[in-house]
Regions:
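C-terminal motif of bacterial Sec signal peptides marking the signal peptidase cleavage site
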Residues: 14-18
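Bacterial signal peptide processing site
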Residues: 20-24
Length: 314
């Protein structure tokens, strides 16, 4: 299960063109951007695609502003949601007991206070109260410059609750109040919840999470965004569903048309397709051509026919 916990991935890639809709709105803090369906044109589709792919990397706007359609991109950075969930997955694995048997008789709540080090100067401290009979637990996990196996560094104190069913299954909720995540040029504060469930060979994470860019103050909101993962021989099958709000553009709804396949140790998928729906039912379909390129098809008027396409390098 620890392998499953380490490979939860969020992949969002889109390109949309000339979709109707847009406007402003308000929503509960900390999201301060547009809350209506995205208005996408050929002048901003690149930006929306990269922001969606990063799942919260608002620095993508500055990175890609000079780019035009058909340009060769620099190598794609790891999606922020992938980085975050891998960080949390590593922490969740530390909650698992060393052996599955529970006490034969009901026991008192057992306190746990344990610190693990990541070998790179960081640590994660578990301060939990565990029911030794039911496996239910509550408490707090404190990250101090903690490095995940998928990259990134996390800092902050996170209330948690959940159930450990055995050494092979765990349900855990992370309740972010103000946690900082840094990965490469990305520096954000996360607030919201991540519900992580994993068992032998697969599992899923559901994110209701806000990212605030610590440089620009702009925000991204992942709403009921679900990542489902299945381990395969030499690869991982990843499927994503949900809604993402981008600060400057509004939201798109995401669903997986064909699962994204990530070869072991790769940060780029080798195949897969995802569809995004914007205003007035306009759609974009992204299909992975290979580990180096992907194609975006566009249905700008929502008729179900894709009348425009472009191919990019990651």
């Amino acid at each position: 299960m620890r392998k499953v916990l380490s490979v939860f991935t969020a992949l969002l890639l889109a390109g949309l063109s000339a979709c109707g809709g847009g406007g402003g709105g308000s929503s509960p803090s900390p999201y301060t951007g547009l809350t209506t369906p995205a208005v996408i044109t050929s002048s901003n589709a690149d930006d929306i695609a990269r922001q969606s792919f990063q799942g919260g990397d608002l620095g993508a706007n500055a990175l890609l502003s000079p780019a035009r359609y058909g340009d060769v991109r620099p190598g794609g950075e790891r999606p922020l949601t992938l980085t975050l969930v891998r960080l949390l997955s590593g922490a969740a694995a530390g909650v698992l007991p060393a052996s599955s048997p529970r006490a034969a008789e009901p026991q008192a709540i057992v306190p746990i206070d344990n610190t693990e080090f990541d070998g790179m100067g960081g640590s994660v401290r578990y301060m939990l109260s565990v029911n030794d009979q039911t496996g239910a637990f509550t408490g707090r996990i404190v990250f101090t410059n903690f490095h995940g196996d998928g990259g990134g560094v996390i800092n902050g104190s996170v209330p948690v609750s959940g159930v450990v069913d055995s050494t092979d299954y765990i349900e855990i909720r992370f309740n972010f109040q103000s946690v900082r995540v840094v990965d490469g040029t990305t520096d954000v504060t996360a607030k919201g919840t991540v519900d992580l469930t994993a068992g032998t060979g697969g599992g899923q994470a559901t994110l209701n999470l806000y990212f605030t860019d610590n440089g620009t103050g702009k925000t991204v909101w992942l709403s009921n965004y679900t990542v489902a993962v299945t381990d395969l021989a030499g690869a991982t099958d990843v499927r994503t569903f949900g809604r993402i709000y981008l600060h400057d553009y509004g939201y798109v709804d995401v669903w997986t048309e064909a699962p994204f396949i990530y070869p072991t140790l790769s940060t780029q998928p080798s195949s897969g397709a995802i569809t995004l729906t914007g205003s007035n039912n306009c759609r974009a379909r992204l299909t992975v051509v290979d580990a180096a390129t992907y194609t975006v098809e566009l249905d700008a008027d929502g008729t179900g026919s894709y009348e425009w396409s472009v191919t990019h390098s990651w």
